[in-house]
Every structure is written in structure tokens, then in C-alpha cells.
């Protein structure tokens, strides 16, 4: 993380005033949604809070050494060309001891939150059968000085825990908090269960990513600001939530697995990374890695796809814009169907020509305004499975999905040519 802070060259908003981890800190973060914020003086902890490392596409592009419109292609490249880790070090430079969450400035963000939440913690675990390492970011609610309730959706970590519980065993884990944006982004990618997110991160780092070996668990993790070691307990569940999710609304309360922590390692002059729930950092980290998934699915249908964006107005989750070089009539509708299938949470998708910048909401609106004929170009799919994060979805989880083909007809393409782009 420190190398990225040196690289970014951005003057952080540094708050010297004493603030509380309960609501006050989060209130400051909400007031500065695009800034890199450092809270130096927390009432409850000697460790400063940093937030906003990944709250713009520009910062993410900088961490990936690419331009903003190349982010999707850069992620696809790393997912398809992972680089094995060759360097593992020790915990030099850390102070180690018994895990005690009361030492950390873990924020309580909103009034109805179930408790303080770790929001930038990456859980590292191994497949009990194969030993393959998995890294994934999860929200974790504090329920004791050494215990967390963790939200685990049915993906890779969920499968690992199932395997361990079938054996009657706990699942060993490490939690890393405070790493560089490229490594953090890699932990959110959708790769096969037998692949390693750290090898994706290593490709982002041109093969130069070094991990550190934990003391009490069989795990190697990035050299994060804070590293916790422990176990997800076999068969133990606690109530988790409420928690404010992507849509700025409360997620439901569930019975979720429990983590018991044993060891804690803190770097000298550590900073605690906090992601504001429903803020841009939360939305980009969760949504942006789905763009390559949509891109690859669309490319199988229409090879001339140019870019895919999950828009910020759609919480980087529910709305997508896709640009293509249209070859035949019907390409737009095929893209709509491919995109909806690739990302089941997607609710509305707009397909535009390659002259439209999908990163610019005004450009997308322009395409809809000038190239859409409602009775021909809008595809409506009622009764489709939607997102659990969509407050408008029905109790059974279904919703109505909409696709808008905002591409110009090929037969009269000249009529739609934009003068400002051609003369």
C-alpha cells in the first residue's frame, strides 16, 4: 500500500481532529466520496484510518499501470495469464501478539449497523482437498475482541468451509487489511476455484509480488498493514447485520459463520484501511471485476465488443453499458442477452456504438435520445431472477430486466454520424 501512496502523488485529505470510530469517522468519509482520506486521531485507537484508495477508476488504472478505458482489458489479461508467486518472506517489521480487535479502529458506519465492521479485510484460505489458496474480500462484523461474524456467499470460500465442516473441522484462515489497490482488486476477480487470486495479482505486479508467511496458520499473504490469523469455526453461526450494501439500503440479517482469531501482526506505523459501505470504493471493488466477465461473454457473441462498464449510477452492479462495432442488425439485442446471462444481477443494459464513450453518462443518454425507437429497440424480460441487493425485486427474488439497443441502424448510418466527431 505504501508504494501506491508514493506513486499516486495525490495530496490526501488529512484530518488531525480527534474523531470517534462510531459514526463520526464514516460521516467524514461520506463528505469526501472521491478523496483519499486519512484520519490521524481516533478516540478508540492509536492506528490511523485510511480510505479512498480505490474510489475512482483513475486510481485503479494507476495501480494497474494502464489508462482508464483499458482497465477491463488489463483485468482480462491478468485472469487469463496468472503468474506463479516466486518470493515469500517473513514477518519482519511487524509486531505480533494475541489477536485483540479492540486495538484496531474498526468503524461503525450507520446507525442501524449490527456492530462495527471490517470492510477491507481479505480472507485467505486453502481448499481442504487440494490445498489451493483462495483470497476474497468479505464484510466482517465484530462480535467480540477476538470473534467476527462473516458474510460468506456461495462461492469459493463457502465451498471450502462446506468441505471442512463435512470433516468436522475448522477452516484455517488469515485476514489481510491494508494492501495496494491492484492486489485488492485481484481478490475480487471471478476465476476458477482451482486458480489463485494472488497469481492474478502477481501479473498486475509484473511478477514482482512478494508474500509473507504467517506464523500460526499455513498461509502466505501480501505484506498488508495488518494481518490476523484464526479459524472459521465448524458448525457455529451468529446473527450478522444489518449492513448497508451497494444500493445504499440495508441488507437482511442472516445467520453467518463465525471467525475465532488467535494472532495479530501489525506493521510499524500501520494504517487501517476502511471502505465506506455504499461508497464509490465499495461499489467499484465489487462491481468492476464483473466487467471482464460480461466482456468475455459478449465477445463470444459479438467479437467486435469494445468496452463494458457497470455504471456508478447503477451502483456498479445493476446497470451496464456496452459499446460495440456493429456488424449486422440484431447485434445489439444479442449483446443484451449475453450481458444479462453473464451477470445475473444485471437489471438494465444499454448497448451503444463505438463512437459513444461508455464511461460518460451524458454520452449514453445521447445515444438513447438519438438512436432508440422504443417499440423496436427495447427488450423487456419479466419474471427473471434478479439481485438480492435490488430493493425493487419481488420477495421471490425475481424482477423485470430491460435491454436498450441504442445502436444506429446500419442502413442509415450516415444519418446518425456525429458532425463533431467527423469534421
Swiss-Prot record:
GO biological process per UniProt: isoprenoid biosynthetic process
One Pfam family from the record: UbiD
E.C. number: 4.1.1.126
Domain of life assignment: Archaea
InterPro entries, per database record: UbiD (IPR002830), UbiD-like_C (IPR049381), UbiD-like_N (IPR049383), UbiD_Rift_dom (IPR048304)
Enzyme category, top tier: lyase
Pathway of action: Isoprenoid biosynthesis; isopentenyl diphosphate biosynthesis via mevalonate pathway
GO CC, alphabetical: cytoplasm
Reactions listed under catalytic activity: (2E)-3-methyl-5-phosphooxypent-2-enoate + H(+) = isopentenyl phosphate + CO2
General function of this protein: Catalyzes the conversion of trans-anhydromevalonate 5-phosphate (tAHMP) into isopentenyl phosphate. Involved in the archaeal mevalonate (MVA) pathway, which provides fundamental precursors for isoprenoid biosynthesis, such as isopentenyl diphosphate (IPP) and dimethylallyl diphosphate (DMAPP).
Protein name in the entry: Anhydromevalonate phosphate decarboxylase
